[in-house]
Curated annotation (Swiss-Prot):
One of its GO terms (cellular component) is plasma membrane. It is found in: Cell membrane. Belongs to the PopT family. It comes from Staphylococcus aureus (strain NCTC 8325 / PS 47). The chain crosses the membrane at residues 27-47, 51-71, 85-105, 112-132, 148-168, 169-189, 197-217, 230-250, 255-275. Is sufficient for resistance to a surface UndP-targeting antibiotic. Active in alkaline conditions. This is Polyprenyl-phosphate transporter. The lineage of its organism: Bacteria, Bacillati, Bacillota, Bacilli, Bacillales. It is a multi-pass membrane protein. The gene is popT.
Length: 283
């Protein structure tokens, strides 16, 4: 029987933290921490005979993700608005650092053929197209007003965001940006944390969409991981590489920003590369 693992709260916290940043995927962090396959299988199995082991695996991860989103939403609003370039350079370093781990676990040197490399290219292209779809202001002021059409929009946005969240390289928060609701959702989270529940209906609409997206997309991903593993990993590698296009904030504008951005980029790269090596050694 699957046991409740306290360490998974920390792993969930890391996943939740990454999902606050447009362009950075919680699925990427799950891969880096070595829990991606089990995470997908557990979500897929929550409405099956594997309910209890799936439930006990997911609960600490969900707790960690909620803690991260509740405690860090204001911080990330500040970092992304006031220190956008260094923040995104840090996450760019994290993303690049995971690529060697992905190449290693996919055993690409002996397993990949032309079709797999074409799938990598397709994954990169998909991320570039998704990035170009977003032309809105990531940090524009938002209100908490609601209408029937907006509730439907938030539900669909949540559904697409959770589906993206499960795929390494595609950020759930970035999909919220594509739908133009990222600022509103972040504001709603911040207000609910302050015990102002005016944003609760928005979070409920998004939350139900997230739940529906998790259930549907996890079963699809689980199927492809089981029956088309190499092609799936090739697509994932493409998504991760393509996500660099999404997180690239532009070049620093002065010497100090260049220095800070390069330092945090290197830190992110080293952290990701080290975690990838540790995970690979423990598999």
């Amino acid at each position: 029987m699957q046991q409740f693992k306290w360490i998974n709260i920390l792993k969930g916290f890391a996943m939740g933290t990454s999902d606050l940043v447009p362009g950075v995927s919680g699925g990427t962090i799950a891969l880096l921490l070595g829990i991606y396959n089990q995470f997908i299988a557990s979500i897929s199995g929550i409405f099956s005979r594997r309910f209890w082991p799936s439930f006990t695996f997911l609960i600490p991860i969900i707790i960690g993700m909620l803690l991260a989103m509740g405690s860090l939403s204001n911080l990330f609003n500040y970092l992304l608005s006031q220190h956008h370039i260094p923040t995104m350079f840090f996450f760019g370093g994290l993303i690049i650092g995971i690529v060697p781990y992905l190449l290693k676990i996919s055993n690409y040197k002996t397993s990949f053929t032309t079709k797999h490399y074409m799938m990598v290219i397709a994954g990169i292209a998909i991320l570039i197209v998704i990035t170009l779809m977003n032309n809105g202001d990531k940090h524009a002021g938002e209100t908490l007003t609601l209408s029937t059409s907006l509730i439907i929009k938030y539900f669909i946005a949540g559904m697409c965001a959770s589906s993206a969240m499960l795929l390494p390289g595609i950020s759930g928060s970035f999909m919220l940006l594509v739908f133009g609701v990222y600022g509103t959702v972040m504001l709603a989270i911040s207000e609910v944390v302050k015990l102002n529940f005016a944003g609760l209906p928005i979070l409920l609409a998004v939350g139900f969409g997230v739940l529906a997206g998790f259930i549907i997309s996890s079963k699809i991903i689980q199927y492809f991981l089981t029956h088309h593993k190499l092609m799936t990993f090739a697509l994932i590698i493409g998504f991760v590489v393509g996500s660099l296009f999404a997180v690239f904030p532009g070049l620093p504008t002065n010497i100090v920003m260049w220095f800070v951005s390069l330092v945090v980029f290197i830190i992110g790269f080293i952290v990701s590369l080290t975690l990838g090596r540790i995970t690979a050694e423990n598999e």
